[in-house]
């Protein structure tokens, strides 16, 4: 996903945060309102940067001020109503053939809501200012998967945004892609 990364807004009082790398588009905008192009995959993101670049070229969208992100999603989502984790899969009516970047840098882990079970919605660390009371890194992300999961299991996301909550490894991409990959064993590949 190409995103226009925003600096920490003044209302977000988490002083350790410099900018917001969240998956949601509430603070750092996506390159476009991309759902309308119907080129996304079953995770409601993209299989490769080339798909996004084609949309941008066809629609006259400037990507020069955008950062390219790649995401890997934990294969379970947390439902606060049942207070438990359950498996989820990509939407089968969309082709999901994620291309893994050759040169990616892990920036941290985001927790994002999927109330409609389609596209990413809110990232409560930034959208609901949870980062003011939960330790995060300079990009408003958890440093580890374990920190993200423990925060959810510990109820720190209660009363923020309606879930379910999904955990995403968030990477910046430098250049290039490899062949199709399913990612690490514990996290399913999920291109941005």
Regions found by a protein language model. Give the residues of each.
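Short aromatic-glycine-(Arg/Gly/Cys) micro-motifs in beta-strand/loop hairpins
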Residues: 1-40, 70, 94-137, 162-171
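Short, mixed-charge low-complexity intrinsically disordered segments
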Residues: 38-93, 139-141, 149-192
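C2H2-type zinc-finger recognition helix
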Residues: 145
């Amino acid at each position: 996903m190409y995103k226009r990364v925003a600096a920490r807004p003044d209302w977000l009082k988490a002083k350790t945060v410099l900018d917001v790398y969240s998956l949601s588009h509430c603070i750092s905008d996506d390159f476009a309102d991309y759902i309308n192009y119907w080129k996304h995959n079953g995770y409601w993101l993209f299989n490769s940067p080339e798909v996004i670049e084609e949309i941008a070229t066809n629609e006259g969208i400037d990507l020069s001020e955008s950062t390219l992100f790649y995401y890997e999603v934990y294969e379970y989502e947390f439902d606060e109503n049942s207070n438990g984790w359950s498996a989820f899969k990509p939407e089968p009516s969309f082709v999901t053939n994620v291309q893994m970047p050759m040169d990616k840098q892990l920036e941290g882990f985001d927790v994002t809501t999927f109330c409609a079970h389609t596209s990413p919605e809110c990232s409560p660390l930034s959208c609901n200012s949870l980062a003011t009371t939960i330790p995060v890194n300079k990009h408003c992300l958890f440093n580890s998967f374990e920190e993200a999961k423990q925060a959810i299991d510990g109820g720190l996301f209660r009363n923020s945004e309606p879930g379910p909550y999904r955990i995403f490894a968030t990477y910046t991409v430098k250049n290039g892609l490899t062949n199709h990959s399913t990612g690490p064993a514990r996290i399913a590949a999920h291109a941005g």
